[in-house]
Regions:
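Active-site beta->alpha loop and helix N-cap motifs at the rims of alpha/beta catalytic domains
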Residues: 1-28, 38
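Glycine-rich phosphate-binding "P-loop"
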Residues: 22-23, 45-46, 157
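C-terminal alpha-helical cap/extension of soluble enzyme domains
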Residues: 95, 99-181
Length: 181
């Protein structure tokens, strides 16, 4: 009930569209599908959710009862294909920052119900999904972007720290595999 009241209070204080972000791995609390659906129904400016619970059943439950035009987006790159199969409309991505064309292609193939083709790209990126979070977010993606020359440094502000040497080495190895294809 506390989560519902919190978001309802936010929604009532502004006309700005709001996208919920369900990331229990960071917050320690899951926004249950029932709460999401209540907010979607009761608060017209809550327009969607970035669903990063890792729970396909929860996404399915939201998709079955959500009002139109409430948007469901994956917040887990590695589950985007599965979430889109359940009806999610897209993703707010981490890996897409480093491989925008490739990841966009994967998502567009999913949205076109071309899942076999999407699965080929999914398998190509699979090893990197995991490495993005080994040393915590955003250490992995910052290291990958640095290695690709897309940012000038991979330094994070404390208490966050950069990717470890072993993770950096693995990112370089998997990056080489991805980019050779």
């Amino acid at each position: 009930e506390g989560i519902y009241r919190h978001y309802r209070t936010l929604a009532e204080s502004t006309d700005t569209p709001i996208i919920l972000y369900n990331v229990p791995g960071r917050t320690g609390v899951n926004i249950k599908s029932e709460t999401t659906l209540r907010l979607a129904t009761d608060c017209p400016n809550i327009i969607g959710i970035k669903e990063a619970s890792g729970n396909v059943d929860q996404v399915r439950a939201i998709m079955l009862e959500k009002p139109d035009p409430f948007i469901v987006l994956s917040g887990d790159d590695h589950l985007s294909l599965s979430f889109i199969k359940e009806g999610a409309e897209g993703v707010i991505s981490v890996i897409g920052n480093a491989y925008p064309e490739l990841f966009s292609r994967l998502i567009h193939l999913c949205l076109e119900n071309r899942f076999e083709e999407a699965e080929i790209i999914q398998q190509r990126l699979e090893g990197m999904y995991y490495l993005m979070f080994v040393d915590g977010n955003p250490a992995g993606i910052k290291e990958l972007l640095y290695q690709k020359g897309l940012i000038r440094h991979n330094i994070l502000r404390l208490p966050l720290v950069s990717a470890s040497d072993s993770t950096s080495t693995l990112i370089a190895r998997v990056r080489n595999q991805i980019e050779q294809r």
